[in-house]
């Protein structure tokens, strides 16, 4: 019972010695198939028996066509049977009856015509074909049958007449090609040429013009080929141009080694066809230039290809200024001034839609590059000046301006040795839309011209317009210092540090201190540090103050040129500054600043101090400890804090004092009891 359950198991899984393929199985199945039944051959003993059989078959066929008149297969089987019986008149009658039912049945016409041709009834077949093409003039199969029969019979004029009747209906391209092939077979090239002329009028597709040109190339002259291509270009116009036509034309000229003609054809086509319709043309032109052109020709091909590419990108977005930059550089490389101007003029016409400066930043460089090209490359000074002028007119200066354009216009006038125009330009800029960059550019110009009085005037106007600009005060003072007018420089610094709205006052203070240091006015410098410390307790100020004190020479050292070691007085002054700073930070509990100060103090002692001084400062260095503090949401967080030994000692002394006071109070109370 257990062994009978489940699928049978294969004990021997090795392959059989004889393998049977699917092909072998199919072959055996076909070989063993039983033969189909065949109808017995009928034999008629006499004519009466034949007539009886024919009558019976005709009755069957008549019943078939009567029951289903529109089924042409019944009619055609009936007519075919009559043809087998050599009853041609009856067969014609059946075909005519069928045509009365459906005169548009092409298979019926074909069967009728072929039966007449098979029995060599040529005139009957010709009449049938004439009737058929008259009733169904758009059925090419009937026309092909007609011309084939006439040509087979050697009736070439009749064949031409049939073709002419057919061509009057303006059939498909295949019919015209068949007519042309007929004339070519009989060497009637003039007739074929005339047919091509009519053919290209009815079907003016470029491929048909190419067929005509190849015909002329084979049987005509090169002038006729050029005439065909020229007529094709003129007929098609720019709307229906095709790259294949120009490629074929150029290759024909290349065969004749007319390389300049071929190049002109390629360029003509590339200038007129859009990029999407001339990809293959570009490849063909590139290949042509590589084979037959020079280096300049190959570069022109690449330029033309990129030119079309940029045009396609600009069709998608005319305000893509990056594409305009690339396009302009491309034309500048080509060396055609008119093309360069055309691209720049088209580019600057794409004004940003909004009056927001971020939209104008890229656009304004088109004007700048245009003006520079006119000046440097085209050498057209008047046109460059006009470009700058038009650009400045276009910018909405009441909302924003571009100092770069004003400055470049002024520098352009300087290069033309027209200083008055340059000053007028910058003066107009400062009057319309003052900016720090404009002032700096104007001042740099006057400084290069050694017009220091004008520089002073400009600095005064800049400070009057924007007194919060620290750099303006510093540069003004440096100008006066460069002119050896230290009193004016010092007065400017004094005015600068007194300004309450400075954007970066620390720069002015530092410049003032460095100025006094360079002048050797150490007492003034010390006073400046003291005044600065009244305004701020920044740790860097204290550290720089201490470094200043260590570097200040004594009166005897000032007179000597040789360097001497740092005096004890200088070290004492520096330590005094460090100690003052340490007290300030300790009182204000500024731990981070205190640590930074102690690090600088320790570095100072390691460099200039004694071992006792170093040990003293090391004892003051803090240690980092981890502490916890409570947050607003009753949670705790850990943080790193600094613990200073001096603070611990003070706390310990205070704790000891309190403990002694408490003990004394207890003793006093016990004695009274």
UniProtKB/Swiss-Prot annotation:
Keywords: mRNA processing, mRNA splicing, Nucleus, Repeat, Spliceosome
Organism: Emericella nidulans (strain FGSC A4 / ATCC 38163 / CBS 112.46 / NRRL 194 / M139)
SUPFAM superfamilies: TPR-like (SSF48452)
Similarity field: Belongs to the crooked-neck family.
SMART domains, per the entry: HAT (SM00386)
HAT repeat positions: 52-84, 86-118, 120-152, 154-185, 187-218, 220-255, 257-291, 301-333, 335-369, 379-415, 417-448, 450-482, 484-518, 520-551, 569-607
Cell location: Nucleus
Role of this protein: Involved in pre-mRNA splicing and cell cycle progression. Required for the spliceosome assembly and initiation of the DNA replication.
Gene it is expressed from: clf1
Name of the protein described by the UniProt record: Pre-mRNA-splicing factor clf1
Assigned GO CC terms: post-mRNA release spliceosomal complex; Prp19 complex; U2-type catalytic step 2 spliceosome
Subunit structure as annotated in this protein's UniProt entry: Associated with the spliceosome.
PANTHER family linked: CROOKED NECK-LIKE PROTEIN 1, PRE-MRNA SPLICING FACTOR
A GO BP annotation: mRNA splicing, via spliceosome
């Amino acid at each position: 019972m257990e062994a009978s359950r489940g699928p049978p198991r294969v004990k021997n899984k090795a392959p059989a010695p004889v393998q049977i393929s699917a092909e072998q199985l199919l072959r055996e199945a076909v070989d063993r198939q039983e033969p189909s039944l065949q109808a017995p051959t009928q034999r008629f003993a006499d004519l009466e028996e034949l007539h009886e059989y024919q009558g019976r078959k005709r009755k069957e066929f008549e019943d078939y066509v009567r029951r289903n008149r529109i089924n042409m297969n019944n009619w055609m089987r009936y007519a075919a049977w009559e043809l087998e019986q050599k009853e041609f008149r009856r067969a014609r009658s059946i075909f005519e009856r069928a045509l009365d039912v459906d005169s548009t049945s092409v298979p019926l016409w074909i069967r009728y015509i072929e039966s007449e041709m098979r029995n060599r009834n040529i005139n009957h077949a010709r009449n049938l074909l004439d009737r058929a093409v008259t009733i169904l003039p758009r059925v090419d199969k009937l026309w092909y049958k007609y011309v084939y029969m006439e040509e087979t019979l050697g009736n070439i004029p009749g064949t031409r007449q049939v073709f002419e009747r057919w061509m009057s209906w303006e059939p498909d391209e295949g019919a015209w090609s068949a007519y042309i092939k007929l004339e070519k077979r009989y060497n009637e090239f003039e007739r074929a040429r005339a047919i091509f002329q009519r053919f290209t009028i009815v079907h003016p597709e470029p491929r048909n013009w190419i067929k005509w040109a190849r015909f002329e190339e084979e049987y005509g002259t090169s002038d006729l080929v050029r005439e065909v291509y020229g007529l094709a270009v003129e007929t098609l116009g720019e709307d229906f141009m095709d790259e294949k036509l120009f490629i074929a034309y150029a290759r024909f000229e290349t065969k004749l080694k007319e390389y300049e003609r071929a190049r002109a054809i390629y360029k003509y086509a590339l200038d007129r066809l859009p990029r999407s319709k001339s990809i293959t043309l570009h490849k063909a032109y590139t290949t042509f230039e590589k084979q037959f052109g020079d280096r300049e020709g190959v570069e022109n091909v690449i330029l033309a290809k990129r030119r079309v590419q940029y045009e396609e990108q600009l069709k998608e977005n005319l305000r893509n200024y990056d594409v305009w930059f690339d396009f302009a550089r491309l034309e500048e490389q080509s060396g055609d001034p008119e093309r360069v101007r055309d691209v720049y003029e088209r580019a600057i016409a794409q004004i940003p839609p909004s009056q927001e400066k971020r939209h104008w930043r890229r656009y304004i460089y088109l004007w700048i590059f245009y003006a520079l090209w006119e000046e440097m490359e085209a050498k057209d000074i008047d046109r460059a000046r006009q470009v700058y002028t038009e650009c400045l007119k276009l910018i909405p200066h009441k909302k924003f301006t571009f100092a770069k354009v004003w400055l470049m216009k002024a520098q352009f006038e300087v290069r033309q040795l027209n200083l008055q125009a340059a000053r007028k330009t910058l003066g107009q800029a400062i009057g319309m839309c003052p900016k720090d960059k404009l002032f700096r550019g104007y001042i740099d110009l006057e400084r290069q011209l050694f017009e220091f009085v004008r520089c002073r005037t400009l600095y005064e106007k800049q400070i009057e317009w924007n007194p919060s600009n620290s750099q303006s005060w510093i540069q003004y003072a440096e100008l006066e210092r460069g002119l050896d007018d230290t009193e004016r420089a010092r007065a400017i610094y004094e005015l600068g540090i007194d300004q309450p709205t400075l954007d970066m006052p620390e720069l002015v203070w530092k410049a003032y201190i460095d100025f006094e240091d360079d002048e050797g006015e150490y007492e003034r410098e010390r006073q400046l540090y003291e005044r600065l410390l009244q305004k701020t307790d920044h740790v860097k100020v204290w550290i720089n103050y201490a470094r200043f004190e260590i570097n200040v020479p004594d009166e005897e050292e000032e007179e000597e040129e040789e360097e001497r070691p740092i005096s004890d007085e200088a070290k004492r002054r520096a330590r005094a500054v460090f100690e003052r700073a340490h007290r300030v930070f300790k009182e204000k509990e500024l731990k981070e600043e205190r640590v930074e100060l102690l690090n600088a103090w320790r570095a100072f002692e390691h460099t200039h101090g004694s071992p006792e001084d170093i040990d003293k400062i090391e004892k003051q260095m803090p240690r980092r400890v981890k502490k916890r503090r409570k947050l607003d949401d009753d949670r705790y967080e850990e943080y790193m804090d600094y613990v200073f030994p001096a603070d611990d000692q003070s706390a310990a002394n205070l704790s000891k004092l309190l403990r002694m006071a408490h003990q004394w109070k207890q003793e006093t109370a016990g004695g009274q009891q």
